[in-house]
Amino acid sequence: MAHGSVTFRDVAIDFSQEEWEFLDPAQRDLYRDVMWENYSNFISLGPSISKPDVITLLDEERKEPGMVVREGTRRYCPDLESRYRTNTLSPEKDIYEIYSFQWDIMERIKSYSLQGSIFRNDWECKSKIEGEKEQQEGYFGQVKITSEKMTTYKRHNFLTEYQIVHNGEKVYECKECRKTFIRRSTLSQHLRIHTGEKPYKCKECGQAFRQRAHLIRHHKLHTGEKPYECKECGKAFTVLQELTQHQRLHTGEKPYECKECGKAFRVHQQLARHQRIHTGEKPYECKDCGKTFRQCTHLTRHQRLHTAEKLYECKECGKAFVCGPDLRVHQKIHFGEKPYECKECGKAFRICQQLTVHQSIHTGEKPYECKECGKTFRLRQQLVRHQRIHTREKPYECMECWKTFSSYSQLISHQSIHIGERPYECEECGKAFRLLSQLTQHQSIHTGEKPYECKECRKPFRLLSQLTQHQSIHTGEKPYECKECGKAFRLYSFLTQHQRIHTGEKPYKCKECKKAFRQHSHLTQHQKIHNGI
């Protein structure tokens, strides 16, 4: 009987054309990752082999990997067959015959390769080439595993394994954070996050990585190699996955869909980030104040508030910003650039998000609903701010006077009181404002523009907040209720004024006679006495 050391063919996976087309995009991506990982594990065992065709094509081709699809029968290379036939099986060793699907074989080899020297010196795999098998044998391959030390070998069922992948079932759980994974190899990679292990080190700069694929990608930064070019626009990429993701910009393909709301994404990472909105998961925590964030970039931006680090400075006016996107948005003020135009009314905006927010005015869509009072909002941020009315949460604190605010914009507006800064000046009348939004609102006085119209009575308004307040007259809605006496109000400012009756607070003081008032209008009326009006 002939035998030889295990070859990459033994641990490779191949599909028929029909089978390949049955796989969805996520499974095809998984296939690519598994084949690369298998190849990496295989060559780490020591055998010196040339790169198999399937890996070369995965590395170089621009289209989907049809090259790994078998059509009809399986073909073996003659040089591999001769290797199998020239060696003789040692009769002293025990032989375990295992009939298994190729995916099963791959899982076992990966599993045992992680357990030290068993794979290197103590056992050999034998793949018997029997020619063409019967059609009904399908994926089965016969492998003879020779070992003195290995006495047991747990057999997996391929159908179960395939169903786990196909159904998205996550059976491998991390004991540290309880996160679950479809494949054991992915769990092994994840565990390195907790252990801090980074076994793959760049010889050029010394930077270390948890995964070999990350090292390979990083190494191309040193070489400047970008072998994957988009045929549509000519943009080049270091890895095939980046090209695949980029091409979806041209095709409009969004294969990753959220099961909660149906929103689709080009990249799986985008879907993962989006799903945290539904789950409420915020895995990134600030070590200074304990605040948590859904995205790592949000944490990085927040941490600069503690360090007062402003790396991005405007060359026009010298104003500095915590992050690059804020600087780019600011620079459009100097350039007068407003590239995002509403097709309904022609109004233009500096950033795309502003246009998206504006368009919901025309559609009337309010998808975000408060579970406490049922009020709906156009923007999620509006819902979050509104919910703080119910929770009375004020997470933003002024470091100068320790006053707290329910929104970050209120804090920024307040802080300019301490520094006296009013950088936004009206070119018509010279009046200056602390916030750009205040200047924008003010300018509508000069232009006479009233873009916000009530659909009930057609009355127009300069500001959206004015329209919102007005609409509550038609609906009779009074969502702001005093918890002391139960009285309800249309506007939050009305509730705030009313609550001063219960608290006795009188924040508005006359500088002439030191008399205090609950409302600013009462102070204004009182000052007329001193002015002789």
Curated annotation (Swiss-Prot):
Cellular compartments annotated: Nucleus
Report which superkingdom the organism of origin falls in. Eukaryota
Q: Which GO biological process entries does UniProt record here?
A: blastocyst hatching; regulation of transcription by RNA polymerase II
- Limits of the KRAB domain: 6-78
What SUPFAM superfamilies does UniProt report for this protein, alphabetically?
Answer: beta-beta-alpha zinc fingers, KRAB domain (Kruppel-associated box)
**Alphabetical list of InterPro entries matching this protein:** KRAB (IPR001909), KRAB_dom_sf (IPR036051), Znf_C2H2-type (IPR050758), Znf_C2H2_sf (IPR036236), Znf_C2H2_type (IPR013087)
A Gene Ontology cellular-component term: nucleus
Identify the main location: nucleus
Q: Which UniProt keywords apply?
A: DNA-binding, Metal-binding, Nucleus, Repeat, Transcription, Transcription regulation, Zinc, Zinc-finger
Molecular function (Gene Ontology), one example: RNA polymerase II cis-regulatory region sequence-specific DNA binding
Q: Name one Pfam family in it.
A: KRAB
Give positions of the C2H2-type zinc fingers. Answer: 172-194, 200-222, 228-250, 256-278, 284-306, 312-334, 340-362, 368-390, 396-418, 424-446, 452-474, 480-502, 508-530
Q: Which family does it belong to?
A: Belongs to the krueppel C2H2-type zinc-finger protein family.
Purpose of the protein: May be involved in transcriptional regulation.
Kindly give the PANTHER family that the UniProt entry links to this protein: C2H2-TYPE DOMAIN-CONTAINING PROTEIN, ZNF44 PROTEIN
- In Swiss-Prot or TrEMBL terms, this protein is called Zinc finger protein 14 homolog
Name the source organism: Homo sapiens
